[in-house]
Amino acid sequence: MRVIVLGSGVIGVASAYYLARQGAEVTVLDRQSGPAEETSFGNAGQISPGYSTPWAAPGIPFKAVKWMFQHHAPLAINLDGSMWQLQWMAQMLKNCNPQSYAVNKERMMRVAEYSRDCLRELRKDTGIHYENRAKGTLQLFRKEAQMEAVQRDISVLEECGVSYELLNANELGRVEPALANAQDKLVGGLHLPNDETGDCYLFTNALAQIAKELGVNFQFNQNVEKLIVEGDQIKGVQVNGKILTADRYVLAFGSYSRDFLKPLDLQLPVYPVKGYSLTIPIVDPAFAPQSTVLDETYKIAITRFDQRIRVGGMAELSGFNLGLNEDRRATLQMVTQDLFPGGDMEQASFWTGLRPMTPDSTPIIGATRFKNLFLNTGHGTLGWTMACGSGKLISDIVLNHKTDISTDGLSIQRYSHAHAA
């Protein structure tokens, strides 16, 4: 079976790898010069199934209003003049209730836990290296109210069988020794020992090389113009004015998937949520993290690679604007220097990317009303966490194999206005 995968971020490359491993003849098309050159390039580096939590949660509307008046707020809303932005925010607000939160959380955890299992198996099979560590994730609380509020998440972790440890301020240094210097600023933390870290860019490029050895044909610097439709099927994809054909097509264009599908009357509810990161060379390992630390107050992740610290976070609703906002850099620097001042901030590189976010925070993985068109997008901040599981899942769906986990609630069908079959 011939399959064309559109997109070479971590989701597209993982999809291509698993398809090829199961015998498909795969071609990957991308406008960039290589894999992982956009959203997968500089993400926070955490692989955190236990923190797979919907952004649309009870209390978020109130918090969003409060954040509008804070200098170092984790969320910023800049109206881009589009009706779509307002519609997407309205859809998200509809999910900010306990019932929707529970449903969405289960779907996200299902994919994320499966994905971690797939990653571990892939690592065992290939020996792939991406500066990975398996030392868990530590969520830090600066306020007692945060320690109390985390009980809701703990109950979900227990239901899902996720290992955790609730720590007081004096115990944080046992997990992250450098935090002994910041103990007076913190009240405690939640440690998930089974989470992992790694450089998504290194991983995606290494996996692309492995996929090439399996026969995957990567075509970069391609202007992917449109899909050619005939009835309920895709007959080809127009690239640089020429038509390429396959038996099946997988769309993994991230935030750009929605506009690409507009001519097909598939209304994909994916909005670009802008995030930022700093990559900082380490000069004093004693003041650097061992794994990933999440600052609950500022919603920022600080992750250890081999000789670098990756600091990622923020959420900005401003359309497809890729400008670098120095105020966001100041927030990332402030949090890092407050907790882990072991990096050379003058040598830090500042980056931004667009996360493809759905209103319910759950990715869109599965079939469409077109018999041979499949979607793998909408992973939001969890593309790295969910990549391998999503790739394996979509490969099984495309090839009509039995899936390892339930696909209930993952396809575009859950959005009735999307005309999905």
Swiss-Prot record:
Its cofactor is FAD. Its EC number is 1.4.99.-. GO terms for molecular function: D-amino-acid dehydrogenase activity. It catalyses: a D-alpha-amino acid + A + H2O = a 2-oxocarboxylate + AH2 + NH4(+). GO terms for cellular component: cytoplasm; plasma membrane. It is an enzyme of class 1 (oxidoreductase). Pathway: Amino-acid degradation; D-alanine degradation; NH(3) and pyruvate from D-alanine: step 1/1. Keywords: FAD, Flavoprotein, Oxidoreductase. FAD binds at residues 3-17. Pfam families: DAO. InterPro entries: DadA, FAD-dep_OxRdtase, FAD/NAD-bd_sf. GO terms for biological process: D-alanine catabolic process. SUPFAM superfamilies: FAD-linked reductases, C-terminal domain, FAD/NAD(P)-binding domain. Belongs to the DadA oxidoreductase family. Oxidative deamination of D-amino acids. PANTHER family: D-AMINO ACID DEHYDROGENASE (PTHR13847:SF280), SARCOSINE DEHYDROGENASE-RELATED (PTHR13847). HAMAP family: DadA (MF_01202). This is D-amino acid dehydrogenase. The gene is dadA.
